[in-house]
A protein has these predicted regions:
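Well-ordered alpha-helical segments embedded in enzymatic catalytic cores
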Residues: 87-94, 117, 247, 430-434
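A short, small-residue-rich loop immediately preceding and capping a beta-strand
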Residues: 15-16, 23-25, 96-118, 130-134
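Low-complexity, highly charged intrinsically disordered N-terminal segments
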Residues: 39-61
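Aromatic/hydrophobic pocket-lining residues that form π-stacking "cages" and hydrophobic walls in ligand
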Residues: 48, 92, 118, 265
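Glycine-rich anion/phosphate-binding loops
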Residues: 33-44, 467
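Short, hydrophobic/amphipathic alpha-helical packing segments
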Residues: 42-46, 89, 223
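N-terminal small/polar loop signature for handling phosphorylated ligands or for N-terminal nucleophile
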Residues: 62-99
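Catalytic or ion-coupling anion/metal-binding cores of large enzyme and transporter domains
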Residues: 1-21, 26-33, 63, 70, ...
Length: 598
């Protein structure tokens, strides 16, 4: 391997990544990757390794690639999506422990499950100097559709809105660069924001354009940071404090981040040995922190993520939150400096001025229209990010990205109120078939149950939300499910309903014809989802709870017949460790205690 005896005494550093595909030196594919997010990051890993060597270290590299949720949505491949995260985190930790001489770790990752897995892995090895290198974003196309819109081509093709040739052409043009995560603030982009916000990544590293010099520079700066951490006796556990996680949750709210981070942030906290945030913690932060970023898919203007980077990214948003006293700026990042110190430098930096000017000159966009002041955000109609409705259907709670509800179905006081008959399905496939067969009508409440961790590995039901989005009356149909959603999903979609149907939750007892009432106040962030009637009867929520308690779980819901044993095991283990609201983690102490008591 080219080892030099003279270098073996150097400090050993490990560069982990989610690299996928086989890329020739000229950039041409030898073998395709699953997605753009892992296609180019070997270049970042190489840049980091070269820097580590230049700084006197001896770099090692190891890989564990990651899947693409966009590729598996609507298929049984989605049953492995969330479980993969836990598996990959374990693999990364095993790889790190397999290099017992390691002095520090760099984790290069980009996308929906690979990046949270990497963050969990590094957090679980907090005694080491470590840093995340975000894999950046792809550039939006000059012609055609962005990566968010193009994910709806399946629904549009099935409704005769596109030919197969048109769909194929749009899909191949969706990304204007070969690498990077999707151009919208889905789970991948939100995870990058969160990594930087909690101090795991160097400042202004989230959402950088993949393949560009500034993107490679992030890898170099990250290597500098880890070596400096080693020299100064700083470890990742010194960065990942309870306040750091609160900062991450505040940035999630300010950006309008993906609801999947409600699964990932608690999991990272668990791995770091920090108390996991509760629904009440999330709710309190979203009530206090305004959304001030105008980005896909939330709008209203729908800027791609690279514009958010050019407008200043995480540091620029932090400047606004510091003014509002909504973040703890005494916290440190992997640079060893406090957020206060970094923001003071950022505010006057040439880097900030240069990138904001690039956005003005090249795109003709005012940076202050991408990352807005709280006052301008209110004027533009930006609303808080998520809320957590509860009720007799969701006694343990549920979640909705309330800022993504179509404004035309929200009244002047900011309230979405919907009451309608339930159409109940036990799989996403059956629900989509009903839409294709025109069995869903305006005013319906679409219920998809049996799709939580036990049923399907808690699949994403994006194909369903995208199908509704392109129905003329789709905004007048609500969705309630114990599954989860893609970070690009929009609409009146209530997910993560708990307890899940297969765990005896009320959502698994609903019947077609039941009357469901949904009320969501986007100003107070208070919401409810209740059974309030049967076919020819109406009653209040309290009576609805009594009736649901008397019902048996539907006899037609069961774990999907194609659910892999790997995922069945994951579902059982995460259920012992706190389930969905606990981040779907493997709490080993609880699992062992459960086994020993049985």
């Amino acid at each position: 391997m080219g080892w030099k005896a003279s270098e073996l005494g150097r400090d050993h550093y490990l560069v982990l990544s989610t690299q996928g595909g086989l890329r020739a030196p000229d950039g041409q594919p030898v073998a395709l990757g699953f997605h753009t997010g892992h296609w180019e990051i070997a270049l970042q890993a190489e840049a980091a390794a070269e820097r580590l060597h230049k700084l006197g270290g001896l770099p090692f590299a190891a890989f564990c690639s990651d899947p693409c949720d966009g590729r598996t949505q609507g298929t049984v491949g989605m049953f492995d999506s969330l479980p993969y995260r836990n598996d990959a985190a374990q693999v990364f930790r095993r790889l790190a422990r397999s290099l017992p001489t390691r002095k520090g770790i760099l984790g290069v990752a980009t996308c929906d499950k690979g990046l949270p897995a990497m963050m969990m892995a590094l957090a679980g090895m907090g005694d080491l100097p470590s840093a995340i290198v975000p894999g950046g974003v792809s550039l939006p196309p000059e012609q055609g559709e962005d990566a968010g819109a193009v994910q709806t081509i399946g629904a549009r093709f099935s409704h005769g809105m596109l030919s197969l040739d048109e769909a194929t052409e749009l899909g191949c043009k969706a990304c204007a660069s070969p690498g990077g995560g999707c151009q919208f603030l889905g789970t991948a982009a939100t995870s990058q924001v969160v990594a930087e916000a909690m101090g795991m990544a160097v400042p202004h590293s989230a959402l950088a354009p993949s393949g560009q010099p500034v993107w490679l520079d992030i890898a170099t700066r990250s290597a500098d940071a880890v070596v400096a951490m080693k020299q100064n006796g700083l470890a990742l556990k010194d960065i990942l404090t309870p306040a750091a996680f609160k900062n991450a949750m505040a940035l999630h709210a300010a950006f309008g981040g993906s609801t999947n981070l409600l699964l990932h942030i608690p999991a990272i906290a668990y791995c770091a040995g920090i108390e996991r945030p509760t629904v009440n913690d999330w709710s309190a932060i979203n009530k206090a922190v305004p959304r001030i970023v105008d980005v896909l898919p939330n709008g209203p203007t729908h800027h791609p993520t690279v514009r958010v980077f050019l407008a200043g990214g995480v540091p620029e948003v932090m400047l606004h939150l510091r003014e509002l006293n909504l973040i703890d700026t005494s916290q440190r990042s992997v640079t060893g400096r406090t957020i206060d110190q970094e923001l003071n430098d950022w505010e006057e930096s040439e880097r900030r001025h240069r990138f904001r000017e690039i956005l003005k000159e090249q795109d003709g966009v005012d940076p202050d229209d991408v990352i807005l002041s709280p006052e301008r955000a209110r004027e533009r109609g930006l609303t808080s990010t998520v809320m957590f409705p509860s009720g007799n259907i969701a006694p343990d709670g549920a979640v909705i990205k309330s800022t993504a509800i179509d404004p035309s179905v929200v009244d002047e006081s900011g309230v979405y109120a919907h009451e309608g008959p339930a159409k109940v399905f036990t799989s996403e496939h059956d629900a989509i078939a009903a839409i294709k067969q025109n069995e869903i009508e305006a005013g319906d409440v679409l219920v998809v149950t049996g799709c939580g961790p036990i049923g399907t590995g808690m699949e994403e039901t994006y194909q369903l939300t995208s199908a509704l989005k392109f129905l003329p009356f789709g905004k007048h149909v609500a969705l309630v499910t114990d599954a989860r959603f893609s970070g690009v999903s929009t609409g009146a979609c209530i997910g993560h309903v708990g307890p899940e149907g297969l765990a005896g939750g009320p959502v698994g007892k609903l019947k077609t014809g039941d009357v469901i009432s949904i009320r969501l106040d986007r100003n107070t962030l208070e919401g409810s989802v209740n059974l309030v009637g049967e076919v020819d009867d109406r009653f209040d929520a309290e009576e609805g709870a009594k009736r649901l308690a008397k019902r048996e779980t539907r006899d037609d819901i069961a774990p999907h017949s194609a659910l892999p044993d790997d995922t069945r095991l994951w579902a059982a283990l995460q259920g012992v460790g706190g389930g969905t609201w606990g981040g779907c983690v493997f709490d080993v102490d609880q699992i062992v205690a459960k086994l020993q008591s049985s």
